[in-house]
């Protein structure tokens, strides 16, 4: 298969699934297996195109991101600030640094991914069932305690297949944050976390990069960026109506597909 076509397919899958609660890792592994793109080069490629998805968040939330560093206040009164982000980053950041190699070596196989797809789906259903009325209906109403709770749930996303947005939005609901506010906080929180993780992976895999792969990488990056832009905007509109439960059932179906076609 031509490099540009691989880049187009994988970039579209990455952009569509990175910020939806369905596990981008699971979809990337499955898609790579189906099109025969699952070698060492594929692992580096996935890191690069993930940066395209991150750029989409930066573009959509650029005013918010600027306000976090004190440039251009978004709203009067109390608002989301840099400390909210730092607090949310700490739990997963510490675990990620301490267990980066263990996670990469032990949890990226088909078996662990199937388990986390199911477990993540169950968590989402439980969060919907037992969540109480929101005390933080907007991003600016999130407290430091709620930010830390969401950050704790983000630790689950270190297990491939759990889904960052699935685990953090679920944590937000259980902490009495609305669906939309939890999702927006999740996306903003993902920027420093994903940049750090992707940067570390790129440094470790730098010797695998080759100028011969430029078509593959550029096509994948651009496609992931464009599709992620559309996916994020659509998801935020959809989430207030359909909640997390349909995504949970989809995860169960994906786990079954994984079990029969990959394992």
Swiss-Prot record:
EC category name: hydrolase
Entry coiled-coil feature ranges: none
UniProt-listed Pfam families: BacA (PF02673)
Subcellular location: Cell membrane
Key words, A-Z: Antibiotic resistance, Cell membrane, Cell shape, Cell wall biogenesis/degradation, Hydrolase, Membrane, Peptidoglycan synthesis, Transmembrane, Transmembrane helix
Cellular component terms (Gene Ontology): plasma membrane
TM annotation in the entry: 15-37, 42-62, 79-99, 107-127, 142-162, 183-203, 216-236, 242-262
Main localization of the protein described in the UniProt heading: membrane
GO terms for biological process, alphabetical: cell wall organization; peptidoglycan biosynthetic process; peptidoglycan metabolic process; regulation of cell shape; response to antibiotic
Reaction(s) the record says it catalyses: di-trans,octa-cis-undecaprenyl diphosphate + H2O = di-trans,octa-cis-undecaprenyl phosphate + phosphate + H(+)
EC annotation from Swiss-Prot or TrEMBL: 3.6.1.27
Entry membrane topology: Multi-pass membrane protein
Known role: Catalyzes the dephosphorylation of undecaprenyl diphosphate (UPP). Confers resistance to bacitracin.
Similarity field: Belongs to the UppP family.
Note from the entry: Bacitracin is thought to be involved in the inhibition of peptidoglycan synthesis by sequestering undecaprenyl diphosphate, thereby reducing the pool of lipid carrier available.
The protein's name: Undecaprenyl-diphosphatase 2
């Amino acid at each position: 298969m031509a490099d540009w076509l691989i880049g187009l397919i994988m970039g579209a899958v990455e952009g569509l699934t990175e910020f939806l609660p369905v596990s981008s890792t699971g979809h990337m592994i499955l898609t790579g297996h189906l099109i025969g793109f699952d070698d060492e080069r594929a692992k580096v490629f996935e890191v690069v195109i993930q940066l395209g998805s991150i750029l989409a968040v930066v573009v959509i939330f650029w005013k918010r991101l600027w306000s976090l560093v004190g440039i251009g206040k978004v709203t009067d009164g109390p608002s989301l600030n840099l400390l909210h982000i730092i607090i949310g980053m700490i739990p997963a950041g510490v675990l990620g640094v301490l267990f980066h190699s263990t996670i990469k070596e032990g949890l990226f196989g088909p078996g662990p991914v199937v388990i986390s797809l199911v477990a993540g789906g169950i968590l989402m259903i439980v969060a919907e069932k037992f969540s109480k009325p929101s005390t933080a209906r907007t991003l600016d109403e999130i407290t430091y305690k709620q930010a830390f709770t969401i950050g704790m749930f983000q630790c689950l996303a270190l297990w491939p297949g759990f889904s960052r947005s699935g685990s953090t939005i679920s944590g937000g609901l259980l902490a009495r944050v609305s669906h939309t506010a939890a999702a927006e906080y999740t996306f903003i929180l993902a920027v420093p976390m994903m940049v750090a993780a992707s940067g570390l992976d790129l440094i470790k895999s730098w010797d695998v990069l080759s100028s011969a792969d430029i078509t593959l990488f550029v096509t994948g990056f651009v496609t992931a960026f464009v599709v992620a832009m559309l996916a994020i905007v659509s998801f935020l509109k959809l989430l207030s109506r359909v909640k997390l439960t349909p995504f949970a059932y989809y995860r169960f179906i994906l786990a079954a597909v994984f079990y029969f076609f990959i394992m």
